[in-house]
Amino acid sequence: MLFDVWGSDTLIHWAGWAMVFIGLIVLNEVGRRTKLGAAIIFGVAPLAMTIYCVAIAIGVSQGAEWALTNPTHVYQNSWFHYAKVYAALAGCWGFIAIKYQWGKIGKAHWFRAWPFVIVAINIMIAVVSDFESAYHFFVLGQSTWVTSEGATQLAGWNNVFNGIAGIINIFCMTGWWSVYASEDKTDMLWPDMTWVYIIAYDIWNFCYTYNCLPTHSWFCGFALLLAPTVAAFIWNKGGWIQNRAFTLAIWCMFAQVFPYFQEESIFVTHSTLDPGAATAVSIAALVANIAAIIYIAYRAKKLGRNPYKQDVFEGTSDLEKATARRAKVDYAHAE
């Protein structure tokens, strides 16, 4: 069993999960469909969060009791959470610039590699966190350890397997410059990022949250990963990476300001901290990403293409449906 969800509080656990899942899908749609929605969600909200967090940091530095006991300081004070939320927001604004074709940068050929760069950075943030946990096992001899936020993590080969899976996952991204705006300007599209990558990424990232965010994984691993994937598979073909960035930023901001929801509310759902489950999930992540990179290499060889400079999933249903949505813009000659 991965989570403590079965028992007298089962309905409450699932209700909390459903609230997060549905909320992320709805807010993602607001952010992608309107400029005003994007401005509020990815402009006003981050500014308010930053002011709030800076105020807490100042209070902590002065030894203020209200700041020292604030849930954001108690539960969200590690480097990881701040790195993740601002990296996600950087991705969002880059994607928005591309989909609205803002100025020279929005149409520039070189900037179309931005999605690859920011996703790789986000993945490496998680990989470093996994290896940080592995350090506690291999160097400090700790099979479990408690973070600065009071979360107990399992440490061991599960971190190594998943860290390697994350590194492989970076190279499973193909067609780095094949990124476009949709004709209706609701989405930034990455057609060559098909189900092959999405599934490999989701398994890896779920394992990361299970390893390193055991008190949050029910929400940030299960609900947060499923929301953008459902959208991409059903109604937003080619837009998965934008869905992922938007929902990740939304969740990270919410969790940073309202950690009470996942830490102390009636909806709290913890992982079982079962070493066997953690190892099994990490092996699944590694196998999935090895399988993905092998399949990508096979298609690249079959089509005679460089998988990073060219599309390797040309001819597949996913790519063709996504490509049909792209705007008629001559990116090759954009300054």
What residues fall within each predicted segment?
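An N-terminal, globular interaction/scaffold subdomain
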Residues: L2-W102
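Short, structured coil/loop segments at alpha-helix boundaries
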Residues: G31-L36, K104-A108, L154, F161, ...
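C-terminal transmembrane-bundle signature of multipass membrane proteins
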Residues: F21-I25, C220-H333
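Alpha-helical transmembrane segments of polytopic membrane proteins
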Residues: S8-V20, A45, H73-W93, R112-A126, ...
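C-terminal ends of transmembrane helices
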Residues: G23-T34, C92-G106, T174-D184, V230-G238, ...
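Generic multipass alpha-helical transmembrane bundles of integral membrane proteins
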Residues: I105-G238
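Membrane-interfacial helical/loop segments at transmembrane boundaries in membrane proteins
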Residues: M1-L2, S61-W79, E132-L154, S265-L273
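Hydrophobic alpha-helical transmembrane segments and adjacent interfacial helices
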Residues: V44-E65, W93-Q101, F116-A134, W195-N211, ...
